[in-house]
């Protein structure tokens, strides 16, 4: 029986970490791709040489020609420029939009049946552009954002309450940026909503708001500490969770930047919402009820994403 094939487009810190995690989980054979010849080949060889020690059997290769991704079942896109201190995700738009055009053409030619996960920032605009450039069905192209943002929220909550991260569920809606919407009402500790924990005296509203703000600033906090790059371990783990749900038809309920066609009152945009990911790609978008405050915050986030998409169209009118 043929193994699944996973193409990792971009061989930087996230790409290398993705290759290692996909190998450890034996999700399939792996191709690390990058236009910088030598880097994917070197990283592929290095990770392959860890397989006898760590006990995984996959064929892991590096390549600098798009033909190497031919027939991939999953493509995870990290290609582009990473953030540096003082930069917002949006500052990357012009540079990375050109990268998405090249990547989209490569996927369209060699892996038109793949499930595509985009990580490149500014995420919501880049995954929207990538879907347009590639021509793939919208349900087969998704952005990795909500899993990461929710994971950060879960960690901060677990530390605050001194409980296991496994007993914390968290919910983050909207764009992957400063306007993201961590929803306290739909986030729980041991099944108890955060809003109830405020009433029970576990945490004050003010402290909860501080945790929510730290979640929004989660990426920038790491960029500020690293100084020469951005997060890669948690983003890679988040994308692998999505890929695994697709490859194994697990039908996980995961918050992702998904294409909306009327849901939440939004059309032809990628925004972070709860989805079900299975063998059909994004099989369902779950619409939850939002109160007035939550809806206003979500609409503000959607507006920020819409502005980025407009900026993309100004640079590449073919996207219209």
Swiss-Prot record:
Binding-site residues, substrate: 83, 89, 121, 152
UniProt keyword NAD, yes or no: yes
Gene3D superfamilies: Lactate dehydrogenase/glycoside hydrolase, family 4, C-terminal (3.90.110.10), NAD(P)-binding Rossmann-like Domain (3.40.50.720)
Active-site residues from the entry: 176
Catalytic reactions on record: (S)-malate + NAD(+) = oxaloacetate + NADH + H(+)
GO BP term, example: lactate metabolic process
Keywords: NAD, Oxidoreductase, Tricarboxylic acid cycle
Enzyme Commission number(s): 1.1.1.37
GO molecular function annotation: L-lactate dehydrogenase activity; L-malate dehydrogenase (NAD+) activity
Top-rank taxon, per record: Bacteria
Record InterPro entries: L-lactate/malate_DH, Lactate/malate_DH_C, Lactate/malate_DH_N, Lactate_DH/Glyco_Ohase_4_C, Malate_DH_type3, NAD(P)-bd_dom_sf
Binding site for NAD(+): 10-15, 34, 96, 119-121
Role description: Catalyzes the reversible oxidation of malate to oxaloacetate.
PANTHER family associated with the record: L-2-HYDROXYCARBOXYLATE DEHYDROGENASE (NAD(P)(+)), L-LACTATE DEHYDROGENASE
Family, per entry: Belongs to the LDH/MDH superfamily. MDH type 3 family.
Protein name: Malate dehydrogenase
Organism: Rhizobium leguminosarum bv. trifolii (strain WSM2304)
Gene: mdh
